[in-house]
């Protein structure tokens, strides 16, 4: 029997009065089952990423990005959130040192760089670049 415990974070779109956008599940690898343990309030958690050190979970939310502290059991507690000055993001990634969080969005073609603090807080927006045009140019013969 496996002694190691696994946790799954499932992000979802929210609607109506429900804002429970992240669901926390215990994963039983022996039996292949998921058991919902809790849910966390965040609107439209369409993408999530874990920090390089594993201590924090970043989530897209309606107007920006939220960060949650992961405790030793995998439970989440909100630290803070930042607005990304644009439409909703849809992808998150950190740099190799964990100093910056990159937020990309389909709707407005923007990539935003957010500073991350050692204590997990999201800081100021460092940069934002909008893509212009229609993507790959086609060569006509």
Positions of the model-derived regions?
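Residue-level detector of Asp-centered blade-edge/turn motifs that repeat once per structural unit
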Residues: 2-4, 52-53, 96-97
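Short loop/turn segments immediately following beta-strands, especially the blade-tip
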Residues: 26-31, 68-74, 114-123
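Conserved small/polar residues in nucleotide/adenosyl-binding loops
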Residues: 139-141
């Amino acid at each position: 029997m496996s002694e190691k415990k696994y946790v799954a974070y499932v992000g979802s779109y929210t609607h109506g009065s429900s804002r429970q956008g992240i669901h926390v599940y215990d994963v039983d690898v022996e039996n292949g089952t998921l058991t919902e343990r809790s849910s966390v309030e965040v609107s439209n958690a369409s993408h999530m990423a874990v920090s390089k050190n594993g201590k924090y979970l970043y989530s897209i939310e309606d107007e920006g990005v939220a960060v949650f502290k992961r405790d030793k059991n995998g439970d989440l507690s909100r630290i803070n959130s930042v607005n990304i000055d644009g439409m909703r993001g849809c992808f998150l990634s950190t740099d190799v040192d964990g100093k910056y969080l990159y937020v990309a969005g389909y709707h407005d073609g923007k990539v935003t760089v957010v500073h991350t603090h050692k204590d997990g807080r999201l800081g100021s927006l460092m940069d934002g670049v909008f893509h212009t045009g229609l993507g790959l140019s086609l060569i006509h013969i």
